[in-house]
Curated annotation (Swiss-Prot):
Species annotation: Mus musculus (Mouse)
Enzyme class: transferase
Post-translational modification summary for this protein: Autophosphorylated. Phosphorylated by activin receptor type-2 (ACVR2A or ACVR2B) in response to activin-binding at serine and threonine residues in the GS domain. Phosphorylation of ACVR1B by activin receptor type-2 regulates association with SMAD7. Ubiquitinated. Level of ubiquitination is regulated by the SMAD7-SMURF1 complex.
Residue ranges annotated for the Protein kinase domain, each copy included: 207-497
Family: Belongs to the protein kinase superfamily. TKL Ser/Thr protein kinase family. TGFB receptor subfamily.
Compartment(s) where it occurs, according to its Swiss-Prot or TrEMBL record: Cell membrane
Major site of localization recorded for this protein: membrane
Transmembrane segments: 127-149
Superkingdom of the source species: Eukaryota
Activity regulation information from UniProt: Activin receptor type-2 (ACVR2A or ACVR2B) activates the type-1 receptor through phosphorylation of its regulatory GS domain.
Catalytic activity annotation: L-threonyl-[receptor-protein] + ATP = O-phospho-L-threonyl-[receptor-protein] + ADP + H(+); L-seryl-[receptor-protein] + ATP = O-phospho-L-seryl-[receptor-protein] + ADP + H(+)
BP GO annotations: activin receptor signaling pathway; cell surface receptor signaling pathway; extrinsic apoptotic signaling pathway; G1/S transition of mitotic cell cycle; hair follicle development; in utero embryonic development; mesoderm development; negative regulation of cell growth
The protein's name: Activin receptor type-1B
Carbohydrate-modified residues: 43
């Protein structure tokens, strides 16, 4: 009621304040001088027999400061004059009785600082919807997650049950069969294309991973244990599924197995209930890649010949087409380099990483090129690949590109040959001509435009083995792919050299 009364009396007061109630007249003995905001003619000063007043209020969003005089007759009721009262929400007023005592500044009423309250726009139906909607959505998400997890667990357990119930799997993998027995079975199998798929799956799911031994753009390589023997497990990231599928497919090509090609054991997409791992299991070679081996060790002339001859033998077998019922298509590697060749315990090479390989069907004369986003290693690309003049419809073009890369690998091996106490530090091909990670444009400029090749030192001429290696390299590096040596020709030349040097292979 007090606030309503204050509000109803506010506007007459505003009129009074804005108009100014003070006047200027002859000053009496007891007259009081006050500041007056509306007394322009008397220098903003008024005189009264009552009180000085200062007030601040907000009118239509505009802040007003009023100072004036209140006559004594208007100071009613006595003791608590109406004009001197403040209202918390409307105005702040102060009366005083000393000359110019109203020259003080008052605070704006707190009510004017508050935002006006808006009536609620939500009815009961809307409020129920706002509360129930998120609850229902959360409940739905929980159900979906539960169903997905339950589905994966059922699939996983069903696969385990099927593997356990498969009698042929039990016959093939008896408890006393070791890794050596399995490798022997693979080597002597009639098809030469690897184990049956259900056996591969069983082997892959009983491997225990031991340690990570390498990383690449495809994923990781682990050393694993299976029945007392070491195996290499290449684990592909999920985005590299095409590479995994392609490499597994190439490794299981009929009649592919060869002592100088990495021994394939199994491939499996392991579903552990929440995500899928893509595994490719192969023989384990503790020396690692040829790149790692040459970085750590120098080689003798005998060691150089063994590495070079075994690499040529593996590549010749890849390139070879075997005609017949159990025939083998010709295969080109397309990413041959020292990091994709492994060194076995006996000092021989095994060609690995067939994810980019292509197969040639001699009957239809077609080339099986898988849709894969990967490209070969730029440093090892042949001139015709760099300048994009390679004939993609002619299988021999891919074989010639492999030979060019093999010549670069031979250069890496020969540099580390310790002859008469002389050897050179390990370096990648073109190390002195391009940066560590060259672009295709940088390689094209060096290889195609400037026609440069790795340097063959003159002192190699003093040793027959190095002289032959240097001559072969140059014949592998011809700009014209058709003029390069074949893998079979290289193999025969190195076989003759091994006899001359009395190298026991």
């Amino acid at each position: 009621m007090a606030e309503s009364a204050g509000a109803s009396s506010f506007f007459p007061l505003v009129v009074l304040l804005l108009a100014g109630s003070g006047g200027s007249g002859p000053r009496g003995i007891q007259a009081l001088l006050c500041a007056c905001t509306s007394c322009l003619q008397t220098n903003y000063t008024c005189e009264t027999d009552g009180a000085c007043m200062v007030s601040i209020f907000n009118l239509d969003g505009v802040e007003h400061h009023v100072r004036t005089c209140i006559p004594k007759v208007e100071l009613v009721p006595a003791g608590k004059p109406f004009y001197c009262l403040s209202s918390e929400d409307l105005r702040n007023t102060h009366c005083c009785y000393i000359d110019f005592c109203n020259k003080i500044d008052l605070r704006v009423p707190s009510g004017h600082l508050k935002e006006p309250a808006h009536p609620s726009m939500w009815g009961p139906v809307e409020l129920v919807g706002i509360i129930a909607g998120p609850v229902f959505l959360l409940f739905l998400i929980i159900i979906i997650v539960f169903l997905v997890i339950n589905y994966h667990q059922r699939v996983y357990h069903n696969r385990q049950r099927l593997d356990m119930e498969d009698p042929s799997c039990e016959m093939c993998l008896s408890k006393d069969k070791t890794l050596q027995d399995l490798v022997y079975d693979l080597s002597t199998s009639g098809s030469g294309s690897g184990l049956p798929l259900f056996v591969q799956r069983t082997v892959a799911r009983t491997i225990v991973l031991q340690e990570i031994i390498g990383k690449g753009r495809f994923g990781e390589v682990w050393r694993g244990r299976w029945r007392g023997g070491d195996v290499a497990v290449k684990i592909f990231s999920s985005r590299e599924e095409r590479s995994w599928f392609r490499e597994a497919e190439i490794y299981q090509t009929v009649m592919l197995r060869h002592e100088n090609i990495l021994g394939f054991i199994a491939a499996d997409n392991k579903d552990n209930g929440t995500w899928t791992q893509l595994w490719l299991v192969s023989d384990y070679h503790e020396h690692g890649s040829l790149f790692d081996y040459l970085n750590r060790y120098t080689v003798t002339i005998e060691g150089m010949i063994k590495l070079a001859l075994s690499a040529a033998s593996g590549l010749a077998h890849l390139h070879m087409e075997i005609v017949g019922t159990q025939g083998k298509p010709g295969i080109a590697h397309r990413d041959l380099k020292s990091k994709n060749i492994l060194v076995k315990k006996n000092g021989m090479c095994a060609i690995a990483d067939l994810g980019l390989a292509v197969r040639h069907d001699a009957v239809t004369d077609t080339i099986d090129i898988a849709p894969n986003q990967r490209v070969g290693t730029k440093r090892y690309m042949a001139p015709e690949v760099l300048d994009e003049t390679i004939n993609m419809k002619h299988f021999d073009s891919f074989k010639c590109a492999d030979i060019y890369a093999l010549g670069l690998v031979y250069w890496e091996i020969a540099r580390r040959c310790n002859s008469g106490g002389v050897h050179e530090d390990y370096q990648l091909p073109y190390y002195d001509l391009v940066p560590s990670d060259p672009s295709i444009e940088e390689m094209r400029k060096v290889v195609c435009d400037q026609k440069l090749r790795p340097n063959v030192p003159n002192w190699w001429q003093s040793y027959e083995a190095l002289r032959v290696m240097g001559k072969m390299m140059r014949e592998c590096w011809y700009a014209n792919g058709a003029a390069r040596l074949t893998a079979l020709r290289i193999k025969k030349t190195l076989s003759q050299l091994s006899v001359q040097e009395d190298v026991k292979i």
